[in-house]
Amino acid sequence: MLVHYHLATTQDLPPITAPLYEYVFAGNGVFKRACRDVMSATIPVCNVRISGLTPVKTEFSTDFGRVPETVVARILEVATEAARQELEALFYLSLRSGEWRLEIPRQIQTYDSVEPCEKGAGSPYERAVIEIHSHHRMPALFSSDDDRDETGFRIYGVIGSLNPARDYWPVINLRIGVYGDWWPLQADRIFEMPPVLRDHNSE
């Protein structure tokens, strides 16, 4: 089975063994958890009291350092240039020998969408640990289209409030995605933040 199911009868959950993800039924609700080589997550998907089971905590752990500020600044630079044309932009961040690598894939850009030209094996999409797209002048909020598209196990981000025509303070919004469910993340946990960039989840 690709998905496993557990009852939380003690505070110590067994190691994650499901090929995709696991549901945990706990005293404080239903949780979804998954792991990959560089991170693991346990996030709530339903808040409900279940008598006789042990409560479970939301957890997110990583085995990598923060994305350097120089890389974040480059993302802002490209996103700002796209915003001048009122286009969205797409970025992937992957790890190579423990170092972050920014990949800007060939992409189809419009005013309200952006898509990579390829998603197959060996593509930047397939390698990505972090996936970010920009919303130019629009707010840094995940849309229903984002929810439909962002169904893998990775960190997702959206950058908004990019207005190159005047002084601006762009905003980033991050979340960990666990196969169609999400939990917000503070950006400074993942990125070295440039002074100009604000965090939606810290406001």
Q: What are these model-predicted stretches?
A:
Residues 1-130, 137-203:
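Conserved beta-strand-loop surface patch within small alpha/beta domains used
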